[in-house]
Amino acid sequence: MIIKNLQEFYRLLIPNVPLIAIDYGNKKLGIALSNQERSIAMPLNTITEINKKIVITSLLNIIEKYKVCGVIIGLPIDMSGAVTEQTNIVMKFAEELAKSINLPIYLQDERLTTKAANNLLKSFGVKRKDRNNNDDAVAASMILETVLDSIKNI
């Protein structure tokens, strides 16, 4: 189920169970995982498959392996806050994922996270090829960190 309110999302979470975040792109998905205490967001991996059924199966495997209790998906909206074509693509993906899992899904504004992740990796001297392979997972960890910071105040 897709939850639009962060407080409601938080109420549905099981204490001391991790969360995952997804940075959804047309060519790849970045995945991040929190620790059980939800104090740290870590890049987990990148899914480079574009077939949605395979992507959802991969996500189900990750959800089962790490026993997560909630999913955060980065929602790409433009700088003015307007919905874009990519926003609609991500919302459709979230709806498809919601049909496959019985977990709360929260859509988090992800403006500029991939760019920020790429810049962060660049500042650490990561080569361009490696940045492109890892920036989505790092972006997912930034999306997750934003939510983790927000739920600390609930």
From Swiss-Prot:
Keywords: Cytoplasm, Hydrolase, Nuclease, Ribosome biogenesis. The keyword ATP-binding does not apply. CDD domains: YqgF. It is an enzyme of class 3 (hydrolase). Its main location: cytoplasm. GO terms for cellular component: cytosol. It is found in: Cytoplasm. NCBIfam families: RNAse_H_YqgF (TIGR00250). Belongs to the YqgF nuclease family. PANTHER family: POLYNUCLEOTIDYL TRANSFERASE, RIBONUCLEASE H-LIKE SUPERFAMILY PROTEIN. This is Putative pre-16S rRNA nuclease. It comes from Rickettsia conorii (strain ATCC VR-613 / Malish 7). The lineage of its organism: Bacteria, Pseudomonadati, Pseudomonadota, Alphaproteobacteria, Rickettsiales.
